[in-house]
UniProtKB/Swiss-Prot annotation:
Disruption phenotype: Cells are not viable.
Name of the gene: kdsD
Protein name per its UniProtKB record: Arabinose 5-phosphate isomerase KdsD
Annotated source species: Pseudomonas aeruginosa (strain ATCC 15692 / DSM 22644 / CIP 104116 / JCM 14847 / LMG 12228 / 1C / PRS 101 / PAO1)
Positions that bind substrate: 72-73, 79, 85, 111-120, 145-147
Keywords of this entry: Carbohydrate metabolism, CBS domain, Isomerase, Lipopolysaccharide biosynthesis, Metal-binding, Repeat, Zinc
Top EC class for this record: isomerase
Gene3D superfamilies: CBS-domain, Glucose-6-phosphate isomerase like protein, domain 1
Domain SIS, first and last residues per copy: 38-181
NCBIfam families: kpsF
Domain CBS as annotated: residue spans: 207-265, 274-326
EC numbers on record: 5.3.1.13
GO molecular function, one term: metal ion binding
Amino acid sequence: MNMSQNLDFIHSAQRTIGLERDAVDSLLARIGDDFVKACELLLAGKGRVVVVGMGKSGHVGKKIAATLASTGTPSFFVHPAEASHGDMGMITKDDVVLALSNSGSTAEIVTLLPLIKRLGITLISMTGNPESPLAKAAEVNLDASVGQEACPLNLAPTSSTTVTLVLGDALAIALLEARGFTAEDFAFSHPGGALGRRLLLKVEDVMHVGEGLPQVLLGTSLTGALMEMTRKGLGMTVVLDEHGKLAGIFTDGDLRRALDRGIDVRQVTIDQVMTVHGKTVRAEILAAEALKIMEDNKIGALVVVDADDRPVGALNMHDLLRAGVM
């Protein structure tokens, strides 16, 4: 591959991006009352937003439906050809149909228009032709027209699909803001994602409890405490007083500091080398908050206590890493 070919590829990419940027700039200038009306209709809908589209518009429609659904507007995609063969039963009079068609004359969508009207379903269109059958049948049409496709043959849907996608994103975010949709709301629709884990996962979901919680009593020999730490594998142990309440915590770091001071591990009890009380958290706080406490205090483990200061669990950095909080 020679330098000339490289330059041709770069020029092609720049031309495509430039044309699509211009199409989006033109869309930006057209946003007005029709967009406001579309948002109002979508907010007023008592059911779901049903997105329909054929071909490339269908692919874009699936993404728009997914974005709406994940940002507080219940939505799903229906293939218009399948709608003509039974899937129309998925749509109710309380729903709002968002129909995508660059030409506005897609046969499979036009076929559905009489039924949509008969059922009294709200119809919003997104087309590149405001004089098309679809645009005229809709309560509001969002102009998704473009001056030119990025394809040099002006055939492959490129600029038009970009504009449609951007317009769909604009609708989704406008509705998100109107609904007061929060990061916590977003997390509930993305429980498997990183944000969902940070905003939903609690300490109680990852902490070690019961037999998995390393614990010794005040007066236990240091060697005994080390054996408990080794058995439980958390790099720490909780130290309890005679009432079962937290007296302290002993960690790998405490052991290193004790050895640096020349302490004979065979001659001391845990009381002499533990960190008194130590940092604690409650089980109901977010795991992300526990992580911040660890980072702020440069510690690798936390004891989880109840309202009576009794240890009920423990967790360390590795637990948070495995849970995907870090």
